[in-house]
């Protein structure tokens, strides 16, 4: 029963977030009523507004190839059944969990004649975990296959398992409207400050069973790096290092964009950058002797059940031996390395009709380059440049009612470099009562609007204050 519960938890966690667009909500792009559209294209500014304040807002992204219906269903009125076999069939060779947070801290913008200026700050966290199919199989079947036949050697982990980055961003931008050409151009500079980073380069775990079943041996190897405020000490324990909070681990990025009002058509390229240069509190961690070997020859049942009761001391000893065996035992200082921020590409167009309706089309591409090394004095393999291009096309339809309520529905057609996904609905609500206070809620890249069938979602909500917003019931930007 315990094995089934553990396997069920792993199946639930096995995600494959489309892992894409984790800092973006594409429906914002063609609203023109929200300051957040300018975050995607520096040539965009809220329609009819002369000044705005962007108050703290929150965005969250999560993804999985498994919906609740893939592994759980109800039987009768009160019985919940977990179907692991059905869930296992839905998993691939590598299954990635993605979780992201995009917290808008504060922003403002104002117009001066044909120019406008913007400022924005935010906090971004991205977490990706890869769980190989072999690990889930091993938890469910142990050292046997699905038919119960013994497997002498089981590979349960192989490759990159974890990467996580948290950074702050401060951005300053400007735009200019060229009246004779009906063209607005914009640019933005960003300062990136890295707070914490952890990357696994290679993780291997192999379980070998002796021919006579007298012993099980686990051979483990790992190699990962940490940087920023959350580092490792010489004993391999995590330790906060706040003295490096305001020094090093930084980078710059640039956005450019343009909008042709007669179409209207627009394009933008965001995060042109080498990424974040991690150069403070960096540690490379690997087993001290090159690898770890753990042997288990069984446990005497009379020791475990001493006097008819479960002996917790025996179990605790086994647990401590396991923890001590896999604990990082070699920590080496690394000079520095770079971690790239994905570069985004946008090409959008919209058609406005009857003054209150808008149909929009947006192409969004994203180039992920991952981790790479500028220099490495200790010759530890930090990683190679791995370019991955993901893309999607979002079709949306919006209506502006009463000059203060905008409703948007859309769908994204997504390609992640390996497969194409045609069903990713989205929705948006923008309320601007009294044309001053604005509340927005956006959700897209949702695999289903029905909760038990949804595998992915991207939600963002927040508040803005607009001054000079008249609008006259129009959706189009004047």
What do the PLM-derived regions correspond to, one by one?
Residues 1-24, 349, 478:
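Bacterial Sec-dependent N-terminal signal peptides
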Residues 3, 91-96, 158-162:
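Short coil/turn segments at secondary-structure boundaries
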Residues 7-8, 46, 276:
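Hydrophobic positions within alpha-helical membrane elements
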Residues 11-12, 50, 280:
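Hydrophobic alpha-helical membrane-insertion segments
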Residues 19-129:
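N-terminal, post-signal peptide beta-strand-biased segments of exported outer-membrane/organellar beta-barrel
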Residues 120-121, 128-134, 197-200:
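Short, conserved acidic/polar surface loops in the N-terminal third of protein domains
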Residues 135-478:
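Outer-membrane beta-barrel porins/channels
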